[in-house]
């Protein structure tokens, strides 16, 4: 398994022959690449946590270019269908549901404490034979993160730390305690001035309360498990 960060909340998880693109705002100011270049990587699926511009991002254009189905809440899949994605190229699901993708890969949709234009905000757990990844989407801290940890043994958690619209470093460190991942990657920070944060502050807070290893990635970096 390998996880590539494109800045903000955009990641690609490559595992079991799949390329799962999450929240692809590839045209974000920190991104080292373009939406067309990401489409050329041939993602097999596009997972969207909610429909705010910085998460829906370039999903429709990439889906059209690569032929990749879009996975999201039922309401979100209706929204992308209105933007020209064929219904057959959407995979609707909802919070608490699980879908199977490929060989031994399951995607579980988690709740998130946030807002959305249509439908509900969410996160994703991607459980595979090579490890389990949790992408929290945009969220505040919530105690039921402990339930996610009961259901899944998380190898990597991607958590927002930008504050203002999501958790900040303090809350995300507590989330790390709740989730008990082996590794944690901060996301959703420093993309624009309102969410400017020092990831080293988050790292220090995590190390004070958890055994999780913090990986501060740069846009374009790849984390291999």
Swiss-Prot record:
Keyword Hydrolase: yes
Example of a GO MF term: hydrolase activity
Superkingdom of the source species: Archaea
Assigned keywords, A-Z: Hydrolase
PANTHER family in the cross-refs: UPF0173 METAL-DEPENDENT HYDROLASE MJ1163 (PTHR43546:SF3), UPF0173 METAL-DEPENDENT HYDROLASE MJ1163-RELATED (PTHR43546)
Family: Belongs to the UPF0173 family.
Protein name (database record): UPF0173 metal-dependent hydrolase Tneu_1348
Organism of provenance: Pyrobaculum neutrophilum (strain DSM 2338 / JCM 9278 / NBRC 100436 / V24Sta) (Thermoproteus neutrophilus)
